[in-house]
């Protein structure tokens, strides 16, 4: 007997093409770790090698436009991590992988974890600009979360002392490297938020390798920075070092020193501006006095030539009035300058964002309370409806009817018996009781007489 449909018949070319498409579409891009062997580089510049482990191996190719981005020369026996696409070389039917990138195994695994966590947090929206909190301007107190013995703390304190010696600084010491470092950094951020002593935080450390900076690529640290109510400035390593903490922080500074520059006022610059204004005022005063002195000299010379005592007295009186006016004008000018400085200081204080932040925090707390109350009310109503439904279901359940002494009898075909004409002698019946099932065989069928109607 022939099957209803004949099996598909492939040519070798079509088979290889189908397998290649399946590999490329189903597997996609994968990460593979293994040991390099049989490494060759022909004149074309492409790399051909075998990637193997203890029990298996696979042929690999890395084309010139991809391998020129590799920062090291692969060696026989070297453990590497590669990102590759799986494919099939159709002419020979050889299964192979096309390598897109290559890294030494240790650093490569860390880089892979870094990329995976970065993609995860980015998908959750932790890097979105809408969640970035503005930095206070000016800051009234700065919190520093770093190692108390590291160079980063020294650099931060040095810059703050140089730029704004009067700015209070609170240090939350923590480890920045090692297995315990992420947990300590998280606790330091939470402690700073609990105490609420400062209005901006610097979280960071000095430079180092990817392994040295790995504490700032920890998911716990990233979520703690995101959850911080106090604005956070990240300052990890050098300008070329970019960590997950940099993406989550409200502002990323390339170095710890740069972070200190960002959060502090340059009092030396303010002092230079005041000194410059003072110098300009002194120059104006000198110029004014020089002109008046020159005028006085000219008048005095003319009086000496004329020798009239009365005119000399009048000129002296006029000179005194002019000197008083000059002094009064200088005092008024200095007074106006002082008043303008006070107005500028008052406007600067009015721009303090702390009240707005407090109102926003209060609004968030109110919304959280309303959300919790709404959820509790909905949960209570749902539980009540569920209990009523269970009670109703138990009331109409046929099992309850059976438990009161009734039974249900069905024929061999499963039909429920309602009349004796449905049954024949010799048939097997199934009777369902409240606590089980009875199987019986019909030996006789008797139809009951209908009761007589009353006259």
From Swiss-Prot:
In the record, biological process GO terms are: DNA catabolic process
Q: Which UniProt keywords apply?
A: Cytoplasm, Exonuclease, Hydrolase, Nuclease
Query: According to the lineage, what is the superkingdom?
Result: Bacteria
Instruction: Report the enzyme's class at the first EC level.
Output: hydrolase
Q: Which family does it belong to?
A: Belongs to the XseA family.
Q: Could you describe the subunit structure of this protein?
A: Heterooligomer composed of large and small subunits.
What is the protein's name according to its record? Answer: Exodeoxyribonuclease 7 large subunit
The gene designation is xseA
């Amino acid at each position: 007997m022939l099957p209803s449909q004949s099996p598909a018949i492939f040519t070798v070319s079509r088979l290889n093409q189908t397998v290649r498409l399946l590999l490329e579409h189903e597997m996609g891009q994968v990460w593979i770790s293994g040991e390099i062997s049989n490494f060759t580089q022909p004149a074309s510049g492409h790399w051909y090698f075998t990637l193997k482990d203890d029990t298996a191996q696979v042929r690999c190719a890395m084309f010139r436009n991809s391998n020129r981005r590799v920062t090291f020369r692969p060696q026989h026996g070297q453990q590497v991590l590669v990102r590759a696409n799986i494919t099939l070389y159709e002419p020979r039917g050889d299964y192979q992988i096309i390598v897109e990138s290559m890294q030494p195994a240790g650093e490569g695994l860390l880089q892979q974890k870094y990329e995976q966590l970065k993609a995860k947090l980015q998908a959750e929206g932790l890097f979105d600009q809408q969640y970035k909190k503005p930095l206070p301007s000016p800051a009234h107190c700065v919190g520093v979360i770093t190692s108390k013995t590291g160079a980063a703390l020294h650099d931060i304190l040095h810059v703050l002392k140089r730029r704004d010696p009067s700015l209070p600084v609170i240090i939350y010491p923590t480890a920045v490297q090692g297995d315990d470092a992420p947990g300590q950094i998280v606790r330091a951020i939470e402690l700073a938020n609990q105490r609420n002593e400062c209005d901006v935080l610097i979280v960071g450390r000095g430079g180092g390798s990817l392994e040295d900076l790995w504490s700032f690529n920890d998911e716990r640290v990233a979520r703690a920075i995101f959850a911080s109510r106090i604005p956070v400035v990240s300052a990890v390593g050098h300008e070329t070092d970019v960590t997950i903490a940099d993406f989550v922080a409200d502002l990323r500074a390339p170095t710890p020193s740069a972070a200190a520059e960002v959060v502090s006022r340059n009092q030396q610059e303010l002092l230079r501006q005041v000194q410059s204004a003072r110098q300009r005022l002194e120059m104006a005063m000198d110029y004014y006095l020089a002109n008046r002195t020159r005028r006085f000299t000219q008048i005095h010379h003319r009086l000496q030539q004329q020798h009239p005592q009365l005119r000399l007295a009048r000129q002296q009186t006029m000179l005194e009035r002019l000197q008083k006016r000059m002094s009064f004008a200088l005092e008024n000018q200095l007074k106006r300058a002082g008043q303008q400085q006070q107005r500028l200081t008052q406007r600067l204080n009015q721009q303090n964002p702390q009240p707005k932040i407090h109102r926003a925090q209060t609004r968030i707390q109110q919304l959280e309370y309303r959300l919790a109350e709404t959820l509790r009310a909905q949960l209570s109503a749902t539980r009540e409806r569920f209990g009523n439904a269970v009670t109703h279901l138990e009331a109409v359940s046929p099992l309850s009817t059976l438990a009161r002494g009734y039974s249900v009898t069905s024929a061999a075909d499963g039909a429920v018996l309602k009349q004796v004409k449905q049954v024949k002698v010799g048939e097997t019946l199934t009777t369902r009781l409240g606590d089980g099932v009875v199987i019986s065989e019909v030996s006789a069928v008797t139809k009951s007489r209908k009761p007589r109607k009353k006259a």
